[in-house]
Design a protein with these regions (language model features):
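Juxtamembrane or sensor-core-proximal signal-transducing alpha helices
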Residues: 141-158, 179-194, 203-236
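Short, strongly hydrophobic alpha-helical membrane anchors
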Residues: 1-7
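Primarily extracytoplasmic/secreted proteins
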Residues: 19-23, 44-47
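Hydrophobic alpha-helical transmembrane segments of multi-pass membrane proteins
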Residues: 9-16, 203-207
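Juxtamembrane segments at transmembrane-helix boundaries
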Residues: 12, 20-39, 52-172, 185-191
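Histidine-centered phosphotransfer motif of kinases
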Residues: 239-240
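Alpha-helical transmembrane segments
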Residues: 40-49, 171-178
């Protein structure tokens, strides 16, 4: 009994660390300022909610439910703390940290880790190894944003066109669908053309990775075009 309780406390601790790291990534992406105290309390709140569900509604405490609940949590956090930024962009801010981290982790787990003798089945059955890959993926997501010089915090000022708004809605919808397929549905219960759930996940990850990077590139180009137009207008006014 004591061993199970200590193991449970270990999982709670790992959950809090994971949520706090994800909140820090969210704050970095959206430029919505979160102090350490707020990050800690928000992380603790979501984990305590999970503990309550696990205690009183154990039948509903599944991996799929927990993952979708965390996604909803980040969207609600973005909508609450990001006002008065337009809702579609706040939803983007809420979805992006979870989806980018998931894409990086899934790519590593499916295509890189097996090269070092760590197949998906081994990682998925080892909780601490899975958490380790997740935390590592959060750090890689941070460096991904830094490497490609994405300034998502400026998008609310520079995504002004109707086309950009539509692209943002498509991006949000695709991120939610990806997360639902990878984390909200038990793919092992599906049988698509005789493929295993692992093969199906690999196809989804590769397909969405290409789609996601394409959508980000288009949106980023829209932002830069708007900035160039603004700079051109300012220079013309200075000349005149």
């Amino acid at each position: 009994m004591l061993e199970e309780f200590l193991q449970f406390l270990g999982f709670v601790f790992l959950d809090i660390i994971e949520i706090m790291l994800m909140l820090k990534l969210f704050s970095f992406i959206s430029a919505i300022p979160f102090r350490f105290k707020k990050i800690f309390y928000l992380g603790l709140a979501i984990v305590l909610f999970q503990v309550v569900v696990w205690t009183f509604l154990p039948d509903y405490f599944t991996v799929e439910v927990v993952m979708m609940e965390e996604l909803l949590f980040f969207v609600l956090i973005a909508l609450y703390y990001g006002r008065p930024i337009k809702p579609s962009l706040l939803v983007f801010y809420g979805l992006l940290p979870m989806v980018v981290t998931s894409l990086i982790k899934q790519f590593i787990v499916f295509f890189i880790a097996p090269l070092f003798g760590l197949p998906f089945t081994v990682i998925s059955q080892n909780t601490f190894l899975s958490y380790g890959f997740l935390c590592f993926s959060i750090f890689l997501a941070y460096f991904f944003v830094k490497l490609y010089h994405y300034d998502f915090s400026s998008w609310h000022q520079n995504l002004k066109s109707v086309m950009a708004d539509r692209l943002l809605l498509v991006t949000n919808g695709s991120m939610f669908l990806y997360y639902l397929l990878l984390h909200g549905i038990d793919l092992s219960s599906l049988n698509w053309f005789g493929m295993t759930s692992t093969t199906l996940r690999q196809i989804i990850v590769i397909f969405y990775l290409i789609l996601f990077l394409t959508l980000l590139a288009i949106l980023d180009r829209k932002v830069k075009q708007h900035l160039l137009q603004q700079n051109g207008s300012v220079k013309r006014k200075e000349v005149s």
